[in-house]
Amino acid sequence: MSLPFPFEPRCLPTTLGSLPHTDAAQATALLLAYTPEIPAWVQLPKRTWHENMLVQYLEGLPGIVEENERAYFDTSRPGYDDALTDFFARYLAVESGDDAALETFAITPERSRGWPALLTALPKRFHPPVVAKGQVTGPFTWGTNLTDQNRRCAYYDEQLHDVIVKGVALKALWQIKHLKAFGAPVMIWMDEPALLGFGSSTFIGISREDVLRDLNEVAGAIHNAGALAGVHCEANTDWSLLMEADLDILDFDAYDHLEAITLYPDELRAFFDRGGSLGWGIVPTLNPQAAATETLESLLARFDAGVASLAARGFERKLLLRRALITPSCGAGTLTPPLAERVLGLLRELAATLRKREGFAGG
């Protein structure tokens, strides 16, 4: 792994994107206020079903049917073969540098009010962001949750599998193109909650090599466009697999699952040696009571304990802090708006406290 640009986050905060609000301008203003250095475009799943992570990126894919808040591929419909051929033709055109073809994979305002809200807000800022962040649903999560007309996982269909992996890459490339226009470096994170079940009987027949190949194909496209590639998984998974993948950022649930990272010291060391950074999901969002009761002091103590645990395994403390992003443990879209705003406040406070304490605040 060779980073597309030098990146040491030094405890800067960022978010995973989702908020429970329904007004995109208000939600975007919140993210820009609390995470101005690495803002993400906001996802608003409570505004409409179309902002659900499984359907938000479906535009431009062949054979998609949406009915009764269910989305699936129908490969039996008349015209599907032509649509499939057209999809791959547009993909090849994008690979050849055709901007018009790339625009056929746009995320429209109906699926993401937060996207145009961020693009409108960014030019009004006095300082450009350190990095602009986009996000996509990862190929494993998308492929194992979307089905065909017979409710068979798309991941197990060779053609649909290929469509999904290339679809993720195309949605990432479209975001990179538009975010780069603001003059800031770009990172794209893949959201992979379904990796929690990788290796279980639920996903029998899916190999480690399959998952690595898909992640690396998307990451390769992101890197070729000059952006950083990251993955978020909010629960326990085989982190050694993700550490082996060609990824620059791994975002984990440091609040409830810190031990998941500490199980793989050799793989983590190799990840750091390649320039990788960790997103510490230390501000809780999955447990509303924890989100309501944790304090700056309690989260600081929990974060320091996590750093100490890795330092005890031979990692240099300063390296851990230089390569740390401070994030929520998961998206905040399931919380109430006041609680989500409390999470953002804690996130900002914790990052600012760490950066001041460690001497990062000036750089």
Each PLM stretch: what is its role?
Residues 32, 118-129, 177-183, 243-244, ...:
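Acidic (Asp/Glu)-rich catalytic clusters
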Residues 119, 123, 172, 176, ...:
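Surface-exposed amphipathic alpha-helices with a cationic face
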Residues 41-44, 133-137, 189-191, 230-234, ...:
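A cross-family glycoside hydrolase active-site/sugar-binding cleft signature
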Residues 248-361:
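Catalytic-face loop-and-helix region of soluble metabolic enzyme cores
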